[in-house]
Amino acid sequence: MLDRRVEPRMLCADLVDVQWKDQSGRTRRGVANLEDISLSGACLQVDRPVPQGTTLRMSYPNGELLGVVKYCVFREIGYFLGVEFEPGNRWSQRHFRPQHLLDPRRLVGRVTQRLKTDVPPLVN
């Protein structure tokens, strides 16, 4: 799947409440595992499909973000939703810091530094 995000994606793991209306107009609720997040979107793992184009509310302690489901794919352990936050809804670590949060750019930087210091020079 093509990654169209402009902002950096933060890997994370936390449970959030989700709410949406199904095709008959009934409100559905569930708990989702927040897989990653950026300023303008998130990836959520849920136990049932949510159709593309559905407006979804993601609630966390002290706040919520509204977005639209851009994709829903099944992968071995559940359904993964790509959610694009609606205008005026942007994620910020000041408002919500997931329980486990990792910036993969920092990890790559650390590995690169370690490789530079751990690799012996080549000898001809």
Label each PLM-derived region with a short phrase.
Residues 1-124:
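Structured alpha-helical
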